[in-house]
Amino acid sequence: MAKHNGIKKRTRYKLQKTLRTRGMPNVTKVIQNFDEGQKVHLVLDSSVQKGQPHPRFHGKTGTIVGKRGRAWLLEIKDGNATKTVIARPQHLTAQKYN
């Protein structure tokens, strides 16, 4: 069989939702706002494919740098490198305590 190298390979359990959280997200999750410099957690919502960053960033914490259209720009540390990730608000959760 041929080798498959899709962007969502090996994410069978990583992007799986629990029974209670299935379905589309709330409207408040879609229209949430953030301030520049605010810390956010990147938790991918598998029911929304639009604006979803690469699964390697799932569970990471980053800092809001700016806004691009409906999406937010985040700076995330990946080892020693600082990477800029573009994600929609459905995939972001504000950190409770800075």
From Swiss-Prot:
Transmembrane segments: none
InterPro entries in the cross-refs: Ribosomal_eL21, Ribosomal_eL21_arc, Ribosomal_eL21_CS, Ribosomal_eL21_sf, Translation_prot_SH3-like_sf
One CC-aspect GO term: ribosome
One record GO biological process: translation
Superkingdom of source: Archaea
Cross-referenced Gene3D superfamilies: Ribosomal protein L21
A GO term, aspect molecular function: structural constituent of ribosome
Keyword list, A-Z: Ribonucleoprotein, Ribosomal protein
NCBIfam families membership: PRK04306.1
Family in the record: Belongs to the eukaryotic ribosomal protein eL21 family.
Protein name: Large ribosomal subunit protein eL21
Organism: Methanocorpusculum labreanum (strain ATCC 43576 / DSM 4855 / Z)
